[in-house]
Regions:
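Active-site "substrate specificity/gating" loop of NAD(P)-dependent dehydrogenases
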Residues: 122-123, 139, 180, 184, ...
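C-terminal substrate-binding subdomain of Rossmann-fold SDR/epimerase-dehydratase oxidoreductases
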Residues: 16, 196-320
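Residues in well-ordered alpha-helical elements
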Residues: 56-59, 67, 79, 86, ...
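Activation loop
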Residues: 37, 43-44, 116, 124, ...
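A conserved pocket-lining segment of Rossmann-fold NAD(P)-dependent short-chain dehydrogenase/reductase
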Residues: 81, 161, 166, 170-180, ...
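N-terminal Rossmann-like NAD(P)+-binding domain of SDR-like oxidoreductases, especially those catalyzing
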Residues: 1-174, 268, 314, 320
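Hydrophobic alpha-helix immediately C-terminal to the catalytic Tyr-X-X-X-Lys motif of short-chain
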Residues: 146, 150, 154, 188, ...
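Residue-level signal for the nucleotide or nucleotide-sugar donor/cofactor binding architecture
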Residues: 53, 83, 91-94, 131, ...
C-alpha cells in the first residue's frame, strides 16, 4: 500500500512509519520538524519536509496516489494550547481539515487519526470507556475532539461517491524511545528523564497524586497496524492505554529508581498546578481488545527500562 504518515519524523509517527516500511508498504512521511527530527524518519520512507497546514505541499503528495493516511501530525502541547491557541487551532483542526479535503479530492479510501484521551476532560468514570461524554478542559482537548468529529462526520457524509473508511484512536500517555527529552511541555515521562540527564530537579506540578495511564509505543503501533485492514474497525473510536494508572509521584519514583537514585538525591520539587490538567485518567480498553484483538503487551517497568536505555544513549540537549 502507498501510505502517508503525517508527523512521521516525530515520536509516535516515526515508529508508525518504521513499522509500515518493515511490513513492506511504500511510505511517505511529511513533517515540519517543529518537534520531530529528520533522523527519526526510517530508511526506506520518502521524506517531505512540510506542514499539514500547507495544502499545496500536501496536494503534491496526494496527487501521486495514496491508499491510506496515518494522520499523526498535530500541535501536541496542552500548555501551548493556552499560550498560543491560534497555532493549536490552525494545526489540529485546520491541518486535519486539509488532510480530509485531499482525501476526498483524491479518493483515498482509508484514514487513521491520532486523537487523545484529553477529549474526556475531568471525568469521574474510571476506567473510562469510549461512550463517556467528552467534556475537554483544555484548548488542546477541544481541538483534538473537534478534529475527531471532522474525521467521522466526513466519513458519514451521504453525498460521498466512494467508501471513505476512518478510525480514531484516543491515545493515553504514550512513552518510549524517541520521546522528547528537551521539551518541557510534552510528555511527562520524557520531561522527567530529561531533567535527570541534565542534572536538573524533577518538578511535579500540583501535589503529585494526580494519575496517568502510560502505554508503550510498540503497543500503540500494534493497535494502529492491526486496524489498518480490519473492516470491524471502520468508523470506530478506540481508547489505547494500558488500563492501569500511576500517580505522578509514583512515576517520579520509578524514573528515579531507573537512574538508581532516591527521591531525596533526585531533588524532587513541587510547583503550582497548571490549567487544563485532568485529575485522573485510566483507559477502558475493552473495545480495542474485542474489535482489534489487541492487548497491551509491554509492562511499565519493562517499557521504562527500554526508554531509559535509549535516553542515556542519545546526545544530551538543553531544554527548549
Amino acid at each position: 500500500m502507498n501510505i502517508l504518515t503525517t508527523g512521521g519524523a516525530g515520536f509516535i509517527g516515526s515508529h508508525m512509519a518504521e513499522r509500515l516500511v518493515t511490513d513492506g508498504h511504500h511510505v511517505v512521511v511529511v513533517d515540519n520538524e517543529a518537534t520531530g527530527r529528520a533522523e527519526n524518519v526510517p530508511s526506506g520512507a520518502h521524506y517531505v519536509r512540510g506542514d499539514v497546514t500547507d495544502q499545496a505541499c500536501l496536494e503534491d503528495i496526494f496527487s501521486s496516489g495514496l491508499d491510506a493516511v496515518f494522520h499523526v501530525a498535530g500541535q501536541v502541547s496542552l500548555i501551548r494550547s493556552f499560550t498560543d491557541p491560534q497555532v493549536d487551532l490552525r494545526t489540529n483542526i485546520g491541518g486535519t481539515v486539509n488532510v480530509l479535503q485531499l482525501c476526498l479530492k483524491y479518493r483515498v479510501p482509508r484514514l487513521l487519526y491520532a486523537s487523545s484521551m484529553t477529549v474526556y476532560g475531568s471525568t469521574d468514570v474510571l476506567p473510562t470507556p469510549e461512550g463517556t461524554p467528552c467534556r475537554p478542559v483544555s484548548y488542546y482537548g477541544i481541538t483534538k475532539y473537534a478534529a475527531e468529529r471532522y474525521v467521522h462526520t466526513t466519513a458519514e457524509r451521504v453525498d460521498l461517491d466512494f467508501e471513505f473508511r476512518v478510525t480514531s484512536f484516543r491515545m493515553y500517555n504514550v512513552y518510549g524511545p524517541r520521546q522528547a527529552l528537551d521539551n518541557p511541555y510534552q510528555g511527562v515521562l520524557g520531561i522527567f528523564l530529561g531533567n535527570l540527564l541534565r542534572g536538573e530537579p524533577i518538578t511535579i506540578f500540583g501535589d503529585g497524586t494526580q494519575s496517568r495511564d502510560f502505554i508503550y509505543i510498540d503497543d500503540i503501533v500494534d493497535a494502529w497496524v492491526s486496524a489498518l485492514a480490519n473492516r470491524d474497525a471502520y468508523g470506530g473510536v478506540f481508547n489505547l492505554g494500558s488500563g492501569h494508572r500511576l500517580s505522578i509521584r509514583e512515576l517520579a519514583d520509578h524514573v528515579l529508581t531507573s537512574f538508581d537514585r532516591t527521591r531525596e538525591h533526585g531533588r524532587l520539587v513541587y510547583a503550582p498546578g497548571r490549567p487544563g490538567e485532568q485529575r485522573h485518567v485510566e483507559a477502558d480498553v475493552t473495545l480495542a481488545r474485542k474489535v482489534l484483538g489487541w492487548e497491551p503487551r509491554v509492562p511499565f517497568d519493562q517499557g521504562l527500562a527500554e526508554t531509559t536505555r535509549w535516553a542515556t544513549s542519545v546526545p544530551s540537549r538543553p531544554a527548549a
